[in-house]
């Protein structure tokens, strides 16, 4: 009986600690011991706003997603479909 209570308490404490370490801001979902990557590449950026394919991700048309991503990533970005809407996604450089 005591062993069951100890195991239950340890599992509960582990879950509480894991939940407390997550920042829900749409950008960071990593454990605190993993080094933070400040690069905008290989990530989605909903903060850029609505992304219209072939317009906002076009270099020729000066699209806002392309402009945002080209400053930090060599290959720019594109409008990536998530569910029923497109979000600006910066390409992975390299």
Curated annotation (Swiss-Prot):
It is found in: Secreted. Keywords: Antimicrobial, Disulfide bond, Fungicide, Plant defense, Secreted, Signal. One of its GO terms (biological process) is killing of cells of another organism. Residues 1-26 form the signal peptide. GO terms for cellular component: extracellular region. Pfam families: Defensin_like. Disulfide bonds join 41-92, 51-79, 65-88, 69-90. Belongs to the DEFL family. This is Defensin-like protein 21. It comes from Arabidopsis thaliana.
């Amino acid at each position: 009986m005591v062993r069951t209570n100890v195991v239950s308490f340890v599992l509960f404490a582990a879950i509480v600690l894991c939940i407390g370490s997550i920042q829900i801001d749409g950008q960071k979902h990593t454990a605190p011991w993993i080094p933070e990557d400040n690069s905008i590449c290989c990530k989605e950026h909903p903060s850029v706003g609505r992304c219209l394919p072939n317009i906002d991700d076009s270099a020729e048309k000066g699209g806002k997603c392309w402009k945002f991503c080209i400053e930090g990533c060599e290959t720019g970005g594109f409008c990536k479909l998530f569910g029923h809407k497109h979000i600006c996604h910066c390409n992975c450089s390299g």
